[in-house]
């Protein structure tokens, strides 16, 4: 779920800070983050960090939460967000491209509601040419990443299901094109609908990522257990993909995940991530019993303890 920076601040407090060292190979980076009601400041090696940069440039994180199940169950927006998040962790040029596309779509939709203004058609055409340039790049990157995820997630799921189930991810692009010019032509062909409904009806903001088991949509026909296995294997595929592309291992965060999993899925997850630095949050230590080596810290009222207080 989405949270604001201010939500991290303890009740009855007006600010919070995070101070730590990131080690990557032989290199160390000192990171200090200070968040208050009014501002957020980040320092890396005592130098103020550009807020427009993604902190994931410093190191990769993959988060597992119980809410991940909604990626399967909910609408296509969450599936697009997952793919965009994965691409961003691999390609830091992607975020500004997507941000510019979203801004252009917002402005175009605003223009579509004012069709009587002078030079309307010249303006809408200029928007379409700009949108096509960014949309085609997003389309290419999504298509490439989904193919890799499909391959890796299939392998994990096939193994977990003892060969009984075949997991698939398919990119159902709303507009398919072989060039930005072809993308523009398809937007042009759809313009009549856009004028009628006063909103942009076609584009990468309408893309769908279909997730299937044995060629059936898991959203509609999968059991709760199958859906849970599928999203775990997709996230494992994300971890593997990041390692393959960057050569670096992600830090794994489990946010109260094991309370939702049976022993088989928990063991499978831990087996595949045993060589990764992993941080687990839980409301009790029972879910940590199957972990061979771990350091446990207890948190109560915002304070951290080595032993149960």
Where do the protein language model's features map onto the residues?
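A structural micro-motif
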Residues: 16, 59, 165-167, 276, ...
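Walker B catalytic acidic pair
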Residues: 255-257
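Short, surface-exposed charged micro-motifs
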Residues: 30-32, 210, 296
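Nucleotide-state sensing region of NTPase/ATPase domains
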Residues: 1-78, 87-90, 94, 150, ...
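A conserved P-loop NTPase coupling/switch region
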Residues: 54-61, 65-133
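Structural recognition of the conserved hydrophobic beta-strand(s) that form the central parallel beta-sheet
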Residues: 20, 277-284
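Conserved NTPase motor "head" modules and their coupling/switch loops across ABC/AAA+ ATPases, GTPases
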Residues: 118-251, 260-264, 268-271, 277, ...
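Conserved beta-strand scaffold positions in the cores of enzyme catalytic domains, especially
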Residues: 61-63, 278, 296-298
